[in-house]
Amino acid sequence: MNDRLRRLIADEIDCCDAEEIDQCRRANVEERLNVLQDLKADTKDRIHDEDLRAVSKLGNETRYTIIRLLVAADKDLCVCELEPLLDVSVSALSHALSDLSSAGLVDRQKRGRWRFYQPTERVRALVNAIDATRR
């Protein structure tokens, strides 16, 4: 990593004369490494397992479609209402909903023998962020 970083900095440096350039490069590499280490520490504090689980669950077409349907419906939906909208088995649909629930992306409520699902505020915010950044 340091060799590549040194080459990058060498390409960026044009302020030094030939005698000072090596010293300037070394100083800039150390400074840049310190900045990058600070960035790594700041980022590490913001990475949470629950965030990774939530984002990874959206990476599946069936689960993402379910989320889109629930957000668009703006009300809770039963599995029997979602089933005709998706090209998957009831078992696969139930499994996907269970995954979404365990990741905190949908809330599940049992009413009698029926289970209803609704999107959480967190997943609504994620969908809104995706929509807002689409080109």
Regions found by a protein language model. Name each.
Residues 102-111, 118:
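Beta-hairpin "wing" of winged helix-turn-helix
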Residues 46-88, 117:
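N-terminal helix-turn-helix DNA-binding core of bacterial DNA-binding proteins
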